[in-house]
């Protein structure tokens, strides 16, 4: 649980910085940061045994883990969060090439906040590691963002991300 909170906080800070760099309004930055802080809240409804599993997940197990974006979006919708936040959470695992989930959205059809969260989320996961994977150094994580720009990640978001790090304004 503590790791989830740290992760959501780090992703929130990164997203806030990206939003500032992109020139988003203060209201948009607030909504983006809120979505980022809650992007993985749906994992509370996924068995811990799956989230903490060291071995590769079976197809069925992965399908259960993938549900976290839907669970999170539904929860926040029910308690009255802004629809922009709900949508960002639902779609934060969509891929720029359309091969993500839950809806297989592609390119600009993916909400901007989801595209920003996807890059920040991946960077944080890569640099902090997981129970099943060792952390990468900053430079290697950046290489991975570049490598998957245009397939997994929005190329424009990656460009902003790189510029931001180059100017050393994003470290959390």
Kindly label every feature range from the protein language model.
Residues 1-172:
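Histidine- and acidic-residue-rich, metal-dependent catalytic cores
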């Amino acid at each position: 649980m503590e790791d989830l909170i740290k992760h959501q906080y780090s992703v929130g800070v990164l997203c806030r910085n990206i939003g500032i760099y992109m020139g988003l309004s203060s209201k948009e930055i607030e909504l983006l940061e809120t979505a980022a802080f809650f992007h993985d809240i749906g994992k509370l409804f996924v068995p811990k045994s799956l989230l903490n599993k060291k071995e590769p997940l079976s197809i069925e197990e992965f399908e259960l883990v993938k549900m976290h974006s839907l669970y999170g979006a539904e929860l926040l919708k029910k308690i009255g969060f802004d629809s922009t936040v709900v949508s960002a959470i639902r779609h934060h695992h969509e891929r720029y090439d359309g091969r993500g989930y839950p809806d297989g959205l592609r390119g600009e059809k993916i909400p901007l906040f989801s595209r920003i969260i996807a890059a920040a989320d991946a960077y944080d996961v890569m640099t902090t590691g997981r129970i099943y994977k060792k952390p990468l150094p900053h430079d290697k994580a950046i290489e991975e963002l570049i490598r998957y720009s245009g397939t997994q990640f929005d190329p424009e978001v990656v460009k902003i991300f790189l510029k931001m790090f180059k100017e050393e304004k994003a470290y959390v």
